[in-house]
């Protein structure tokens, strides 16, 4: 953080205090911090000689992922004896996004590694339903969405579409920010860390997929810090998608917006998504039913239970 103060007058300013409220997720030198009414405030003191300009730099440690904004700064200046002082509040617009910690590939759990590996393999061999090149007779197990009705009418028997191989696989990671099916209150510190680790896992898997040519997206049953916007990023494999993904992760509140089964029920899979990774601390019949709905739409669904997770039916 950089503070710049100037004194253009011919008279000195014996002392100037700059004070601003800081989020707990940002760390400064303990000597410059003070707790007031439960909030942390960063304070700096200056002596400004006549017609001088001072620049002071502070090292900031990003302790937690988040979306941090500094909107006002309180400025106080006084004379040498401290008998009088002038106060002024200045508006500012400082904005800092702290991204989640990314895992090393070796830290990714085996089920998620296998899921990612299958997505990348099918990048070269997976049929793309948008690239129809003909038809063949129906076989047991063919999904209903692949029926070729025009060819079936011509031949008098059921036909299914045949497709060229796809070079653009799409995957979607779905994160459950609730620790249990009965949770309604905010997460405790220990539970919050479990979900933070899950968010790091989700971001790492998506970025690895994008780096290797696949399209990846992320959604969660929570909202973002600004205006309660739902946490949803549709799959893409562009370079800009990586920045958008990290920004989304930084802005997530981890406060449950709706139950995970309700979130899944209202979710419509984006066109072309054939791989879905669910990250959740628990799995019950309601979640299983929604996962089965995605499978009926032709998607491969993998449900990974997070640390200490439980399966109930």
Question: What are these regions, as identified by a protein language model?
Answer:
Residues 236:
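A charged helix-plus-loop insertion that forms the helical arch/lid used to bind
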Residues 1-228:
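An amphipathic, basic-hydrophobic helix/alpha-beta surface used to engage anionic
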């Amino acid at each position: 953080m950089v503070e710049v103060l100037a004194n253009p007058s011919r008279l000195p300013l014996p002392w100037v205090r700059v004070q601003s409220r800081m989020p707990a997720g940002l760390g400064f030198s303990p000597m410059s911090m003070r707790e007031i009414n439960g909030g942390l405030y960063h304070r700096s003191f200056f002596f400004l000689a006549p017609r001088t300009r001072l620049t002071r730099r502070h090292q900031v440690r990003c302790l937690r992922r988040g979306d941090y904004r500094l909107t006002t700064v309180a400025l106080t200046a006084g004379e040498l004896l401290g008998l009088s002082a002038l106060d002024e509040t200045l508006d500012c617009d400082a904005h800092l996004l702290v991204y989640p910690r990314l895992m090393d590939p070796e830290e990714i759990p085996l089920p998620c590694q296998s899921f990612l590996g299958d997505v990348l393999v099918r990048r070269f061999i997976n049929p793309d339903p948008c690239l129809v090149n003909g038809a063949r007779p129906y076989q047991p197990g063919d999904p209903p969405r692949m029926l070729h009705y025009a060819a079936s009418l011509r031949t008098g028997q059921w036909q299914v579409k045949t497709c060229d191989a796809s070079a653009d696989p799409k995957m979607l990671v779905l994160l459950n920010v609730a620790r249990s099916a009965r949770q309604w209150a905010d997460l405790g510190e220990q539970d919050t860390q479990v979900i933070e680790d899950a968010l790091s896992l989700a971001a790492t898997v998506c970025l690895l997929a994008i780096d290797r040519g696949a399209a990846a997206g992320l959604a969660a049953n929570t909202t973002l810090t600004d205006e309660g916007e739902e946490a949803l990023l549709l799959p893409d494999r562009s370079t800009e998608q990586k920045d958008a993904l990290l920004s989304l992760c930084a802005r997530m509140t981890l406060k449950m917006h709706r139950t995970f089964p309700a979130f899944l029920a209202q979710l419509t899979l984006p066109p072309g998504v054939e791989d879905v990774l669910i990250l959740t601390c628990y799995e019950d019949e309601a979640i299983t039913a929604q996962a089965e709905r995605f499978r009926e739409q032709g998607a491969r669904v993998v449900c990974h239970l997070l640390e200490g997770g439980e399966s109930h039916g």
